[in-house]
Amino acid sequence: KTGTITEGKPRVASIRWYHKEAKHYAPILTALEERSSHPLASAIVSYLGVADSSEIEVSSLHEVAGQGLEAEVAGLRYRIGRSTFISELTPLTDEVQAGLEEGARLGATASLFASEEGVLALILITDSLRPSSKAAITELQHKGIEVIMLTGDGPASAKTIAQAVGI
């Protein structure tokens, strides 16, 4: 899907902070994402922009393929990634679940940022559809070719995008 149906240029649509001290946690989120190899990490760093992470000491960082990353900052464990990965660290509140469902309806990829103390932020990332995608898929279907879409996105997000282009 990425780069074929969509433009392959992910951008952060929004960050919903669940903690009143967002100014404290934004530099930590930036520091972790600067060290990530995930393709969406640079979109998050760009969105946060001015969050100064130079003083943040990150230790024990490791990435779990397809799930997210975990690290320690000032003795506290943090995670960024899929909801299933985050829920192993801390429970997901009804408010967070509602945010995840909203993101899926919008066709966004959702990433959660959490500490052992709870979910700190919901990050919604989108990638614009290529203007030619729907027409190209329709043309293939008219030629009798069955079109399927492969994606690492969650089922709800994938369904939204597939419906938008006629798959």
PLM region spans:
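Cytosolic catalytic headpiece
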Residues: 2-167
